[in-house]
Amino acid sequence: MSINTEEEFIGMQKVSDVVAVVLRKMKSYTKIGMTTKELDDYGGELLTSFGAKSAPKHTYEFPGFTCISLNHEIAHGIPSDKKVLKEGDLINIDVSAELNGFWSDNGTSFIVGRDIHGHKRLVDSSRNILIDRISSIRPGMKISDFGKSIERQAKSNGLKVIKNLAGHGVGRSLHEDPEYILNCEDKSNNSRFKLNSVVAIEMFISTKSSYATELNDGWTLVGNNGGYVAQHEHTILITKTKPIILTSANEI
């Protein structure tokens, strides 16, 4: 969406604060021995307490309030009472919601307990690339050039990107134009970032895989070549200078 009034800005900031706080609290709530279903139920309770609706459940009938992906899962992981969190697990929580007609989206990957499997470099790289690349966005920048810069930075860290997952426009629905803000160059995409537009910027930084494939459950995405992926995501407002990070309350 494009924000043209103070009321629209306030609406977007409110829903962004909600998803950001829910994400931050879910991260703090995460404990060894907990199931991902318990964690998701907690997230659902928080969303309800704010008067917000889970975006994936409301829009796509996703079987969970939030997407919780574990270890080799990249995205859209289904919360389950059979998935018990263990020391060193790589977990990703993605929280998106609707409040008063406005939608926002954010996510983070982190390590459960101690980093016994050496995931810290991947997680830190994903987070740092997100913040660094967001700060570079200006109106008129080609989205393809932005994606190219993400992949370049990932490669400089000895890592890859997932090339068929993307950030997207957001605001009056969960997914809006621009539909594909990829983590790589797409020469066929001539679209540019627009002043006052709201977009969700997502990193999908990978150790081995370059593409996501869907499991038989119809939701869960994994890498085509194994390995691990870290995802970090903010919803931002593009301004004449540095973008405003609407979901900054998640503290990722």
How should these model regions be labeled?
Residues M1-I252:
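Active-site neighborhoods and metal-handling regions in enzymes and metal-associated proteins
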